[in-house]
Curated annotation (Swiss-Prot):
This is Anthocyanidin reductase ((2S)-flavan-3-ol-forming). Keywords: Flavonoid biosynthesis, NADP, Oxidoreductase. Belongs to the NAD(P)-dependent epimerase/dehydratase family. Dihydroflavonol-4-reductase subfamily. It is an enzyme of class 1 (oxidoreductase). It comes from Vitis vinifera. PANTHER family: ANTHOCYANIDIN REDUCTASE (PTHR10366:SF288), NAD DEPENDENT EPIMERASE/DEHYDRATASE (PTHR10366). Optimum pH is 5.5. Hyperbolic binding of NADPH and NADP(+) to the free enzyme, with a single binding site each. The most likely enzymatic mechanism is sequential ordered Bi-Uni-Uni-Bi, with NADPH binding first and NADP(+) released last. This enzyme is strictly pro-S stereospecific and the reaction mechanism involves two hydride transfers from two distinct NADPH molecules. Pathway: Secondary metabolite biosynthesis; flavonoid biosynthesis. One of its GO terms (biological process) is flavonoid biosynthetic process. GO terms for molecular function: oxidoreductase activity. SUPFAM superfamilies: NAD(P)-binding Rossmann-fold domains. Optimum temperature is 45 degrees Celsius.
Amino acid sequence: MATQHPIGKKTACVVGGTGFVASLLVKLLLQKGYAVNTTVRDPDNQKKVSHLLELQELGDLKIFRADLTDELSFEAPIAGCDFVFHVATPVHFASEDPENDMIKPAIQGVVNVMKACTRAKSVKRVILTSSAAAVTINQLDGTGLVVDEKNWTDIEFLTSAKPPTWGYPASKTLAEKAAWKFAEENNIDLITVIPTLMAGSSLTSDVPSSIGLAMSLITGNEFLINGMKGMQMLSGSVSIAHVEDVCQAHIFVAEKESASGRYICCAANTSVPELAKFLSKRYPQYKVPTDFGDFPPKSKLIISSEKLVKEGFSFKYGIEEIYDESVEYFKAKGLLQN
C-alpha cells in the first residue's frame, strides 16, 4: 500500500497539522528521522497546507484528510504509528455558543482520535496538547501561589460566572478530563503537555493569534492588550513559553519511557505591568505602554514546570530570546517597523 512507511523507522501521527504548534512539531519530528503522518481538514486548501508541502523535502511526511467529528477518518493516518500527537483544538473566541462551537467538538475530537488509537495496535503512547487554561483558573486569593500538575481549572466557576472567552478554558479542561477518563478505561498510555501562552515564530502563512497576543504591548494593539489583561485577571498570571520548547517537550515526553501524567511547559511567569516594563527597556524603539493605573502589578500565581525539568528536560529559550525572535518574526511579516 502507498500509505506504508519504510520498516524500521519510528512513525508519528500529528493530528491537526496546519496549526502553529503542530506544523513545527511535524518539522522537528522529521528532523529527528521520524516518518510522519499528519491530518488536515482540507488538503486542497493551498494556503493552509503550503508549509506542510514544503516540509516534505525534510523527510517522509504524508498528509491525510481527517475531521475531528469523524472517528473513522483517523484510522488510516494512525495505522502503524508508534506515537500519536493530538494537537488540534476548535477555537472560536467570539463564539455566542461555546458549548456547541468549542466544548462538545473538543471532547468529541479527543475521544474520536483515542478510539482510533485503541484500534491501531501499533500505538505505544498518545500525547495530548492541553493548555495552562486547564490548570490555572480558580478563585484563590493572594500572590505567589504556585500551581502545578495537581491543579485543575474550576469548571463550576467558569460555567456559572461565564467570564469573557470562558469557552476556551472550559473546552481545554473538559477535553483533557475526557482524555484521562478514556485512557484509564481503555488502557491507553496517555501523556498531556500543558503549555502556556506561546510565542516565537511560525511556519504557518497566517500569524498565530497567540504570538499576536504576546506581541500586543509592542504593536500597541489595544484589543489584544485588553486580552492580555483579561488573561492575567482570569488565570492569575501572564505565563509564556517558546513554541519550539513546547514542541520539543512533546517529543521528549513521548520518547521518555518513565514519563507519565501531565507536564506543564512554561518558561516564564510575569504580569502585564512587569512584562511592559521589561519590553520597554529591551526595545526602546517601540512605544510600549508602562502606565497601567491601578491594574494589579504582580501576578497572582506561578505556573511551575518543575516536573518536566526534573524529568530531564531543559528549556532552550528564556523570556529575552522568546521576545527577540517574536520581534524579528513580526518585522519579517511586515507587522513591525525596525
